[in-house]
């Protein structure tokens, strides 16, 4: 979700090597030159852009690029694993939008100031990667071990569920 070029340079080559997997990319920057860069990185896959396709074509595509705003949070429910962008720049984007769908969440190292990311890491529902090798090893483990994939997803979802109602709990403890 909300990927940047350093993120795309990690996950796109991995998916190029795994022909049976499908990818949904929601780039943070949807300028035409950035979309062309993404397209140039993808090899041997049928790629469609959300704004230029039909539901039938999107369902058949190997890669769906979300080239408009406002859809990302609802798109996570179609995935098995989420990669949250920004972790190789100033910081990651929203991890909870993906975790609420009971899926493992992966992100880069610039996540320390984000309490949700730290909580996901501690819960076992979130994973930090620093290199392509980290990402490749983790994705291979998740996709080849269904029990691990499901456990990590359940832990991510449980972490979000634990946060639900936090405002009510705080307000209940405050005497007015």
Located regions from the model:
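Nucleotide-activated sugar donor-binding and catalytic core shared by glycosyltransferases
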Residues: 1-176
């Amino acid at each position: 979700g909300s990927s940047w070029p350093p993120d795309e340079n990690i996950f796109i080559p991995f998916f190029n090597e795994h022909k049976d997997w499908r990818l949904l990319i929601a780039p943070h920057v949807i300028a035409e030159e950035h979309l062309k860069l993404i397209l140039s990185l993808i090899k041997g896959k049928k790629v469609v852009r959300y704004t230029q396709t039909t539901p039938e074509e999107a369902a058949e595509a190997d890669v769906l690029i979300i080239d408009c705003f406002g859809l990302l949070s609802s798109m996570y429910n179609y995935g098995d694993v989420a990669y949250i962008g920004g972790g190789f720049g100033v910081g990651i984007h929203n991890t909870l939008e993906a975790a609420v769908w009971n899926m493992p969440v992966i992100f880069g190292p610039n996540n320390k100031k984000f309490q949700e990311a730290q909580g996901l890491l501690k819960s076992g529902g979130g994973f930090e990667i620093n290199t392509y090798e980290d990402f490749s090893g983790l994705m291979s483990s998740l996709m080849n071990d269904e029990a691990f994939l499901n456990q990590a997803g359940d832990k991510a979802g449980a972490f979000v569920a634990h946060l639900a109602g936090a405002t009510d709990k705080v307000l209940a403890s405050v005497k007015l």
